[in-house]
Amino acid sequence: MQSRLSPIDVVFPPYNASQLEDVLRPRAARGIKEDALDDAVIPLCAALAAKEDGDARRALDLLRISVQQAEQSESEQVGINHVRQAQNQLEFDQITPTIQNLPLQQKLVLFSVIINEKNGLSNISTGEVYGTYEMACENAGEKPLTSRRVSSLIQGLDMAGIITAKKTSRGRHGMSKRINSCLPPAFDALQVMSSAEPVMNEVIEGRYRLQNRL
């Protein structure tokens, strides 16, 4: 099954799912053999892109990569599973360079969030992140930043869409943040960080005294 779909560089306004289907269908008719698409593929590509940001380029990328996934698996028809694979690939392709290019100190903060989540925590407090971060800095041979500076790095990760950090009131103890990662479930952020920053291997292999909540 050969495809003549190729990446394009065109500026589109945000579209809804129905409009995105109208964009995809003529492209598919020109570039993909008849009967090579499951009927649900174009509606799914359109719905996923509309839910994300309404960008027609994303819808076209989803369709193109779905076809590539089908070709690689030697499938006779592009199916929903290929669209899901394409969605994962796009997410990974978008987030990987962002994680790789984080400064070391911000990688250490992100590591501290992830390792606490792996320990079963969610809605992690700023203090819990900072305590783990101090241990991570020790394993990396780095001097820890102040808690105020780390709070700023957390905010940067939030703005980048890597984590969520929602402010909550602790009454007379002031404000805190409840922090969770936003990474795709199958995305191995630790591997990405260690490949970009070799010292992260020492951090990942280090020992940590992590908190458990009753």
Region locations from a protein language model:
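Conserved C-terminal helix/linker of AAA+ ATPases
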Residues: 69-94
